[in-house]
């Protein structure tokens, strides 16, 4: 195949949905460092944290917590970008999703993150409410 001068090969584009799935798969496999690097390169991924926490695979959700342990050390000024996404999933119907979001908020630990956790003190699920009480008591 002949390519004329000036003609450029267009890179294959990946949809956000596909990229979110790849992130979840990498987190499940324990490749958190790769995802840390992605977050460092593009801050829009913080908007996807809530979606990642809805994944049924426990290893993915655990990976999100580990991800934020890294990010709080390497990019402390950026972690609050996840707050809107995390606040959104606090209204999720599934208690474990709300609990996971609260756990990530506690890792972030900023005054704004803790204020969001405070709003969940009366969660209808007793386990979620207990997690909130434990976090606030440790503050």
Residue map of PLM features:
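Short inter-helical turns and helix N-cap capping residues of alpha-solenoid HEAT/ARM repeat scaffolds
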Residues: 56-57, 93-94, 124-125
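Short, mixed-charge aromatic SLiMs
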Residues: 88-95, 128-129
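Structural detector for internal amphipathic alpha-helices that build alpha-solenoid repeat scaffolds
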Residues: 2-7, 20-41, 59-76, 96-110, ...
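Amphipathic alpha-helical scaffolding segments comprising HEAT/armadillo-like alpha-solenoid repeats
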Residues: 2-17, 40-54, 76-89, 110-122
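Short, Lys/Arg-rich amphipathic alpha-helical interaction segments
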Residues: 115-139
């Amino acid at each position: 195949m002949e390519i004329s001068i000036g003609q450029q090969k267009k890179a294959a584009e990946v949809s956000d949905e596909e990229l979110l799935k790849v992130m979840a798969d990498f987190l499940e496999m324990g490749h958190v460092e790769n995802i840390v690097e992605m977050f460092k390169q593009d801050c829009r991924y913080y908007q996807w944290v809530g979606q990642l926490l809805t994944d049924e695979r426990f290893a993915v959700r655990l990976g999100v917590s580990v991800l934020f342990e890294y990010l709080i050390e390497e990019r402390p000024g950026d972690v609050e970008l996840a707050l809107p996404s995390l606040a959104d999933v606090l209204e999720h119907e599934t208690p474990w999703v709300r609990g996971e979001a609260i756990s990530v908020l506690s890792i972030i630990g900023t005054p704004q993150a803790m204020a969001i956790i405070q709003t969940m003190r009366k969660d209808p699920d007793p386990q979620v409410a207990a997690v909130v009480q434990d976090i606030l008591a440790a503050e």
